């Protein structure tokens, strides 16, 4: 009986785009989505850490997930957003995304685990793939992606 219930349980994801690829961020980790704003650079940090922003009096580090995943440099456009991720430790991290597309609800049965080649930069960042009407969505592993302290 529990297996049947789990099969029909759902999870909501915010779909974001990096170029032509779609990624899903589990909505339980999303604290806020803000327009691109001035990022203050911080010296002597990893190249994927873009700097910090001041969001309602709170200083939040902002990272380029593109660079962390080994993709090309971010191109800032009018559609660029910063997703504020709230980690299980209650710390917040801003993540640059090319575009926030929509919120989708996926049945757990529509999510498949994937095994990337260890040389694929996405191997450490994607926990599975969700099947959706517009195609496939690579689901980001938020706890795994931010397991190390960013700033």
Task: Walk through the language-model features, giving the residues of each.
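An acidic, low-aromatic, low-complexity terminal/linker signal
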Residues: 1-151
């Amino acid at each position: 009986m529990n297996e049947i219930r789990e099969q029909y349980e759902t999870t909501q994801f915010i779909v974001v785009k990096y170029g032509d690829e779609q990624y899903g961020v589990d909505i339980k980790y999303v604290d806020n989505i803000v327009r691109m704003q001035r990022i203050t650079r911080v010296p002597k940090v990893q190249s994927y850490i873009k700097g910090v922003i001041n969001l309602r009096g709170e200083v939040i580090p902002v990272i380029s997930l593109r660079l962390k995943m080994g993709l090309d440099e971010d191109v800032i456009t009018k559609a660029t957003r910063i997703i504020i991720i709230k980690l299980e430790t209650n710390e917040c991290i801003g993540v640059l995304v090319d575009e926030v597309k929509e919120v989708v609800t996926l049945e757990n049965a529509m999510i498949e685990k994937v095994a990337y080649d260890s040389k694929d930069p996405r191997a450490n960042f994607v926990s599975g793939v969700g099947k959706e009407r517009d195609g496939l969505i690579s689901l980001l592993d938020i706890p795994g992606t931010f397991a190390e302290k960013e700033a």
